[in-house]
């Protein structure tokens, strides 16, 4: 693999919408998996009703008030994790939500996923049934790992298959060899839309997604 270099903290310590747009086409590297970021959303400060920090500084949102370039990972509905990158100046709570990635290389995501499911169950017969049924599920569109490229659309799906959870909260993305963002010079076309999956602040055009992702991402190879 070509050597990937983490982005500097200065990249994240800027206007959140600028960071969100410029993250499109950047590489997310996480513990052996390399993926192109394809969809982001901005959550900005106390005046954004959809931003967790709108309710003030809490133990959960403390990382958002800290230095830029750290991960903010939280659990929603008791089952889905979401990955964010802290942005702006320290003291101003803001972050970019990573909503989608296109996997270029991986360390067998399906093996990782099934191992996690099996760890919750002791009966071997039940294990095999659950794994079999879940792989056929359309809810998460479980990918065929015989294909080298995988499109993970949705923050919960992204975290599930990459293995990102709350233990990866508050990770420094600048000084971390296993979890960082890199620039390989990709300039992908993207569209701007209203944010989705929220009930407040729905009028803000703070969602950015690669346009015609199938063609834009086809044949990308950084190995």
Curated annotation (Swiss-Prot):
Q: What is its EC number?
A: 3.2.2.-
Name the enzyme's class.
hydrolase
TM spans, by residue? none
Q: Which GO terms describe its molecular function?
A: alkylbase DNA N-glycosylase activity; DNA binding
Give the keywords, sorted.
Answer: DNA damage, DNA repair, Hydrolase
Give a GO biological-process term: base-excision repair
The secretion signal range is none
Pfam families, sorted = Pur_DNA_glyco
- CDD domains the record matches: AAG
Q: Can you tell me which family this protein belongs to?
A: Belongs to the DNA glycosylase MPG family.
Q: PANTHER family attached here? A: DNA-3-METHYLADENINE GLYCOSYLASE
Question: What name appears for this protein in its UniProt entry?
Answer: Putative 3-methyladenine DNA glycosylase
Source organism per entry reads Rickettsia typhi (strain ATCC VR-144 / Wilmington)
